[in-house]
Amino acid sequence: MAPVAYRANSRWSLAWLSPDGQKLLLTRVLRTFAYGYLAVVLALYLEQLGLDGFQIGLVLTGALAGSALMNIFWSIEADHFGRRRTVAIMAVLMALGGLAFALTDNFWTLLLGALTGTISVSNSEVGPFLTVEQAVLPQTAADERRTWLFSLYDMLGSFGGAAGALFAGIVGVFASLGLHGADMYRPLFVLYAAIGVLNLVVFMRLSDRVEMARVEGKRKFLGIHRSKATVAKLSVLFGMDAFAGGLVVQSLVAYWFHLRWGLSPEVLAVIFFAANVVAGLSFLGVGPLATRIGLLNTMVATHLPSNVLLMLVPLAPAAWLAVALYLLRLSTSQMDVPTRKSYSMAVVDADERTATAGITNTARTIASAFSPVLSGFAFGVAALGVPFFVAGGVKIAYDGLIYATFRKVRPPEEELRVQSRLTRQAAARP
C-alpha cells in the first residue's frame, strides 16, 4: 500500500497519520504501560515465588526465546497469513501469558507462560507486535514523516512505560489491603492479561490497508530478495547490540538496585517512571538531529556516550549517584531506537519490510535471550557489576562496527538531500 498523503502543517494534530497508524500508536501505549510495571516487578515477583537468581534468569531468557521463536515464524508468514490476524493472535497469547503468571507458582508453568513470546522483560518490545507494526507504520504516513513517526511511536511507548513503572508502586497499596508476598503482585498480571484483550479489540478494527499488497511472482526465501546482504549485516550487528542490552534489561536493573542498595518496589517505581520519561523526552530530538546529520550518524553519536555512562553505574559509591548515572544514560541511549527502525525500513524494498523487521528483530531477540541467565548467574555469585561492564564494552564495539559497515549506505530521503545540495552547488557556480 502507498503511504498516506503528507500534510505539512498538521504535525501535532496527527492529521498526517492514517487512522490505522493512530490505532497502532494506541496499542503501543497500552502494551508499554503493561511492560513498564512488569519490568519493575517481574524479577521481584519471581523471587517471592521462591525462585533463585539463576531460575529468574532462566524465566527471563525463556521470555526472550519465546519472542524469538514467534518472530521467526511470523516474519515469514505474517504477510501471507495477514498482518491483522497475526497481531490479533499475539494479543490472545499476551492475555494467556499474563493469566499463566497470575495463577501459578510452578517454575515450569511460568517458563511455559514466558515462552508465549508476549511476556516482556523490559519496557520495550522486540517481539511479533513490533515486527508487524514496524512494517505497517511506513505505509501510514509519507516518507518525509517516517523517522518522526518512529520517534513518536517510541516516545509514546516510553511515556506508556513510564506510567506503567509508576503504577508498579500500587503493590504497596495491595500490601496495605492484606495481600503479602507473591499475592500482592498477582493483580498486576491479571491486568496484563486484560491489556492483551484490549489490544485484540483495537487490532480487529484495523483496515485492510495494513495488509501487504499481493505481489506476483515467485515467493522469495524469508521474504527477502534484493537486500539479502544488507539484512544479514544488520541482523548480525543488531544482534550484537541486543546481546549486550539483554544483560541490563530493566527487570534486571531493577533487581540490581534491589540487591545492591535494598530499594523497595515503591522506590523502584519512581526511578523507572523517571527513567522512561527521560527516554521518552529524548525522542523529541531524534527527528531534527537525524535530518541534520543523518540516521546512521544519529544512531552512533547518541549511543556511544550512553554506553560509557552504563559502565559507570556499578562504580557509584551511593544509590543516588547510581540512579543519577542511570537516568543520565537514558537521556541519549534510546535515541538510536527510532533511527534504527527508520534506517532498516528505508534501505530495503517495501515488500521486504515485514521480513526485514522480523529477521532483524529475531536476531536481536535470539542474541538477547542468552543474556539474562548470565546476569542472573553473576548476581547469584555477587559479581553485581560485571553485566554493566560487559554490556557497555560490547555496545561500544557495536557502535564502531555499524558505522564502519554502513557509513556509505544512505536512505532515499538522504540521497535526495545530497543530490539536491549538489544540484544547488552546481547551479551556483559561474
What function would you assign to each model-found segment?
Residues A2-S18, D208-A242, L259, R421-L422, ...:
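Juxtamembrane intracellular "pre-TM" segments in multi-pass secondary transporters
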Residues R85-A100, N297-L312:
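Structural signature of the two symmetry-related core transmembrane helices
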Residues L58-I76, F273-G285:
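Central cavity-lining transmembrane alpha-helices of secondary-active solute carriers
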Residues L14-A65, T230-F238, A242-F272:
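Helix-loop boundary and gating motifs at the non-cytosolic
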Residues V29, G97, F107-P128, L321-M335:
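Hydrophobic core of transmembrane alpha-helices in multi-pass small-molecule transporters
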Residues A168, G172, A193-A213, Y398-F406:
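C-terminal membrane-cytosol helix-exit motif in multi-pass small-molecule transporters
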Residues A43-L44, Q48, A162-D183, L259-R260, ...:
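Transmembrane alpha-helix termini and helix-breaking/packing motifs in multi-pass membrane transporters
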